[in-house]
Amino acid sequence: MYLAVEIGTVDLNPVLKGAVATILYFAVGMAVLLVGFYAVDLLTPGKLRQLVFIDRRPNAVVVAGAMYIALTVVIITAIANSYSQLGQGLVGVAVYGLMGVILLGVALLAMHLLIPGSFHEHVEEPQLHPGSFAVALILLAVGGVTAAAVS
């Protein structure tokens, strides 16, 4: 007795196209995140890598982490709403992602001006400062609003 299962033909073309699209969206997303990292580095006192990874400043971690979460939400939303054509979708993700970097940068600059005391001192403090959570929530709100505006 034969027990055979008919598999049919397998078309890998859509899978390969999807894999290539995933790699390209990843590359664009990482490029936007790198631009975001350097923007945060420019807008916060000291070298961000040193403050986070060497000096272990908790306020720098909170602010930088919120910035990356907010920017990631914008990138994910841009990818989810991207155009059906890959080229247009990649350009859209890059444009919306960079808009997110700019808007989050504007929010950080506004907080520099509006936060009482020295924003720079808060970020560099070795003890966790409650103000860093307020800054983080504002950044998350800006990222959420920017993501919602992505069409």
Swiss-Prot record:
**Where does this protein have coiled-coil stretches?**
none
- InterPro entries referenced in this protein's UniProt entry, alphabetically: DUF350
A cellular component term, taken from the record's GO annotations: plasma membrane
- Topology in the membrane? Multi-pass membrane protein
Q: Name one Pfam family in it.
A: DUF350
Query: Which spans are transmembrane here?
Result: 20-40, 60-80, 90-110, 130-150
| Cell compartments where the protein resides | Cell membrane
Task: Keywords in alphabetical order, please.
Answer: Cell membrane, Membrane, Transmembrane, Transmembrane helix
Family to which this protein belongs: Belongs to the UPF0719 family.
Tell me the protein's name.
UPF0719 transmembrane protein MAP_1032c
The species this protein belongs to is Mycolicibacterium paratuberculosis (strain ATCC BAA-968 / K-10) (Mycobacterium paratuberculosis)
